A protein has these predicted regions:
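Surface-exposed interaction/gating patches
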Residues: 32-76
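Vicinal oxygen chelate
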Residues: 1-49, 79-96, 102-130
């Protein structure tokens, strides 16, 4: 999807034939044939959430919910799109601004002990326990 069609992040929806997309390490040809050998889960296990700031979070969350065919809920007064393995939270932004502003990463307890929150280049990163 082009960011103008689905604002907030670059979204790509693909599938690979002859594989179960629900498997954590399902085939993904663009990554090459030996990508699984490069996986290291000592600290990071996966992305489980993102936060998108939008001028109209209610409207944008409805669009994302429709496009992703996923449930739209409200948590802590913020609209959220709930997918099979992650949650997309929409928050209020300044006028004319739409962007990814946070990610939530499932991490090992060892990583979490190093610190739960960091900010990098304006992006809030939160590490949560396994």
């Amino acid at each position: 999807f082009h960011p103008k069609d689905l604002p907030g992040a670059l979204v790509e929806i693909d599938s690979v034939t002859n594989t179960n997309y629900k498997e954590k390490y399902a085939d993904w040809p663009p990554a090459g044939s030996d990508w699984r050998a490069q996986v290291n889960e000592d600290y990071v296990l996966g992305i489980v959430g993102v936060t998108i700031a939008a001028e109209n979070p209610d409207k944008l969350s409805k669009l994302w919910s429709d496009v992703l065919d996923s449930k739209l809920t409200v948590e802590n007064n913020y609209p959220c799109v709930v997918t099979e393995n992650a949650k997309i939270t929409f928050v209020q932004a300044e006028i004319g601004y739409v962007d990814l502003v946070g990610i939530k990463i499932k991490a090992s307890n060892e990583r979490v002990k190093l610190g739960r929150n960091i900010k990098m280049l304006g992006l809030d990163i939160e590490f949560i326990s396994e």
